[in-house]
Swiss-Prot record:
This is Enolase. The gene is eno. NCBIfam families: eno. Its cofactor is Mg(2+). (2R)-2-phosphoglycerate binds at Q163, K335, R364, S365, K386. GO terms for cellular component: cell surface; extracellular region; phosphopyruvate hydratase complex. Belongs to the enolase family. Gene3D superfamilies: Enolase-like C-terminal domain (3.20.20.120), Enolase-like, N-terminal domain (3.30.390.10). Pathway: Carbohydrate degradation; glycolysis; pyruvate from D-glyceraldehyde 3-phosphate: step 4/5. InterPro entries: Enolase (IPR000941), Enolase-like_C_sf (IPR036849), Enolase-like_N (IPR029017), Enolase_C (IPR020810), Enolase_CS (IPR020809), Enolase_N (IPR020811).
Length: 426
């Protein structure tokens, strides 16, 4: 395998108009690769640190020139000459160079940019698609696209508490068909909203962001859209939520729909939703430090529904290990920039799978045209991916890459479908 001959980072803009890091890499055989780093709006307090400049004169303090400089001057000096295929060694060099427990010195955005660029370069050098290079010749499962078609919470300016209302085309026979169904429901929802005189402005992730009286009202609108598009809710297209409960948790209480609620009251609320709606997955239903609540929720409803830890686990093997020990959640949300390196991301997924936890690959609200997570979803057999609505270039870039992968795999491609969720297990 070729060695790393050149590395250069630059500051680019993400889908929210905020700066992020992009890294170019050239190997000594001439192979060139590039990777860009995403950024979140609702972030868990235990995530790896995204290094920002803090200079209010540039991009309201959100510039990433320090992270860029750390790549070009500090990281490059250590990894130039490394074999590009030695992913774990490259990542470990950067982690040790940083020396902190949260990548706060060099910046997770600096480290991840180099980590992902190295993987792309090594795959290109080996003349393999990224998903096959990382996952091996048996990588063939296409994930269910969890499409965020209605936004609330931190992703929208509305009265809806729940951050993401997603559709999951579980009844489709292929990713291509699932993508088509998702787009059909998305356009159907736009018509439903228009017919009711509701706004059709978009949130960060391409979903609609109308001002609605309640979270149940949002679910009812989506059910109407599914039916209007000619699909059967629960059989063809199911529902999923990302509550992002840490965003409205303070002083031991959840301020939800205008009332202060306890963990037990929130669990009872979700129990009612699961009984009424065809929900297959609920992400971050409780605060990231409410371990007892998570364990109780999982004990009570874990056989019926996927309970996903995002802010709870932050793609961190150590926090996931605590979740496994305390029986909190039954699925891991996978965000490469939460942990800040590819090898640690893979470690988290492998730990989850070994312990019977499902995984959902995920974008961030601040995205670029980078498609790495699409390949990762197939490489790591996550069976699920969320990359926003079937709209906006930075969202569909990932879904379109999955179309290409499915086409390339041909008859060996398998769509995860309903089997990806506990609600449909025998």
């Amino acid at each position: 395998m070729a060695t790393i001959e050149f590395i250069e980072a630059r500051e680019i803009l993400d889908s929210r108009g905020n700066p992020t890091v992009e890294v170019e890499m050239i190997l000594d055989d001439g192979t060139q690769a590039r990777a860009a780093v995403p950024s979140g709006a609702s972030t868990g307090q235990f995530e790896a640190v995204e290094l920002r400049d803090g200079d209010k004169k540039r991009y309201s303090g959100k510039g990433v020139l320090k992270a860029v400089e750390n790549v070009n001057e500090k990281i490059a000096e250590e990894v130039l000459g490394c074999d590009a295929s030695e992913q774990r060694i490259i990542d470990q060099i950067m982690i040790e160079l940083d020396g902190s427990d949260n990548k706060g010195k060099l910046g997770a955005n600096a480290i991840l940019g180099v980590s992902l660029a190295a993987a792309h370069a090594a795959a290109d050098c080996a003349e393999l698609p990224l998903y096959q290079y990382l996952g091996g010749p048996n990588s063939h499962v296409l994930p269910v696209p969890m499409m965020n078609i209605l936004n609330g919470g931190a992703h929208a300016d509305s009265d809806v508490d729940i951050q993401e209302f997603m559709i999951a085309p579980i009844g489709a026979e292929s990713f291509k068909q699932a993508y088509e169904w998702g787009a059909a429901v998305y356009h159907s929802l736009k018509k439903v909203l228009k017919d009711k005189g509701l706004a059709t402005g978009l949130g960060d992730e391409g979903g609609f962001a109308p001002n609605l009286p309640s979270n149940a009202a949002a679910l009812d609108l989506i059910l109407d859209a599914i039916k209007a598009a000619g699909f059967e809710p629960g059989k063809d297209v199911a529902l999923a939520l990302d509550v992002a409960a840490s965003e409205f948790f303070e002083d031991g209480k959840y301020t939800f729909e205008g009332q202060a609620k306890t963990s037990a009251e929130m669990i009872a609320y979700y129990e009612g939703l699961i009984a009424k709606y065809p929900l297959v997955s609920i992400e971050d239903p409780l605060d990231e430090e409410d371990w007892d609540g998570w364990a109780e929720f999982t004990k009570k409803l874990g056989e019926k529904i996927q309970i996903v830890g995002d802010d709870l686990f932050v793609t961190n093997p150590k926090r996931l290990a605590k979740g496994i020990e305390t029986k909190a959640a039954n699925a891991l949300l996978v965000k490469v920039n939460q942990i800040g390196s590819l090898s640690e991301t893979i470690d988290a997924v492998e730990l989850a799978h070994r312990n019977g936890y499902r995984c959902m690959m995920s974008h961030r609200s601040g995205e670029t045209e980078d498609t790495t997570i699409a390949d990762l979803a197939v490489a790591l057999s996550t069976g699920q991916i969320k990359s926003g609505a079937p709209a906006r270039g930075e969202r569909i870039a990932k879904y379109n890459q999955l179309l290409r992968i499915e086409e390339e795999l041909g008859d060996s491609a398998e769509y995860a479908g309903a089997s990806a969720f506990p609600r449909f297990q025998a």
